[in-house]
Design a protein with these regions (language model features):
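Long, compositionally biased intrinsically disordered regulatory segments in eukaryotic proteins
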Residues: 1-125
């Protein structure tokens, strides 16, 4: 039998938290923490999120925290959690495409794609 919804949500959040922190580490080296924080906050506001999960993400010059998301999403649908966080990552890459002419995307694509696929598999089980 599959995992309980709350456990699956926590696993998804852990995966996306690690992914977003990897993105943070590399992208902040290239464009700086302040500009990256601005891009992420802008992306959060522009990403559709019917479950309101993205509103709980905390962004500062120190990085990204999904701790409040962990607390809020216990009863959320794993599909909603995945869609919201996947949408954030995809839209952030769109911002990087426009603002850095794919420089950041080229650096991160090989790390991000396998994790997005892993998240898809987790939700589809």
């Amino acid at each position: 039998m599959g995992k309980k919804k709350a456990d699956l949500n926590l696993d998804l959040i852990d995966l996306y938290s690690n992914l977003l922190n990897e993105i943070w580490g590399k992208a902040s080296e290239l464009i700086g923490e302040t500009l990256l924080a601005f891009f992420i906050l802008l992306t959060i506001k522009r990403t559709p999120d019917k479950s309101s999960i993205l509103r709980e993400i905390r962004v500062s010059e120190d990085g990204i925290s999904l701790e409040a998301v962990r607390k809020q999403c216990q009863d959320a649908s794993p599909d909603d959690v995945h869609r919201a966080l996947q949408g954030l990552v995809k839209n952030l890459f769109n911002v990087f495409t426009v603002t850095t002419e794919n420089v950041i995307n080229r650096e991160l694509f090989s790390k991000v794609l396998p994790k997005l696929r892993e998240a898809e598999k987790m939700v589809s089980r």
